[in-house]
Curated annotation (Swiss-Prot):
Coiled coil: none
Stored InterPro entries: Fe-S_cluster_asmbl/transfer, FeS_biogenesis, FeS_cluster_insertion, FeS_cluster_insertion_CS, HesB-like_dom_sf
GO annotation (BP), single: iron-sulfur cluster assembly
SUPFAM superfamilies per UniProt: HesB-like domain
GO cellular component, one term: cytoplasm
Organism, scientific name: Rickettsia prowazekii (strain Madrid E)
Similarity comment: Belongs to the HesB/IscA family.
Pfam families: Fe-S_biosyn
A GO molecular-function descriptor: 2 iron, 2 sulfur cluster binding
Identification of the protein by name: Uncharacterized protein RP484
């Protein structure tokens, strides 16, 4: 079976760092998509304080990732990375389901 989502070492390290710095207990991180951007959908990453009833839970490299069922089919097989450059740092996604993305790389369509 295909992994729902995988993390690079850099992404796992950054998620662990963010959770350690957070002032309140954290169940994991939530990864999803929402409407937005010029291509139609954007990714989001946020703290997850608890697991919702139907969340898919993936544990990889010491990180707990929660994905709601509406997002699952759109990100199946994706890889989450963390990239730092001189001017910005961000989580990025390589998604085999993407059909198109915008020129700036902020949004995509499936």
């Amino acid at each position: 079976m295909k992994n729902v989502i995988s993390l690079t070492d850099a992404a796992a390290k950054q998620v662990k760092l963010l959770i350690e710095k957070r002032a309140k207990p954290t169940f994991g991180i939530r990864v999803g998509i929402k409407s937005g951007g010029c291509a139609g959908q954007t990714y989001y990453v946020e703290y997850a304080d608890n697991k919702n009833q139907f969340d898919e839970v993936v544990e990889e490299k010491g990180v707990r990732i929660l994905i709601d069922p509406k997002t699952l089919m759109y990100i199946l097989g994706s890889e989450m990375d963390y990239v730092e450059t001189n001017f910005k740092s961000q989580f990025t996604f390589t998604n085999p389901n993407e059909k198109a993305n915008c020129g700036c790389g902020k949004s995509f369509s499936v």
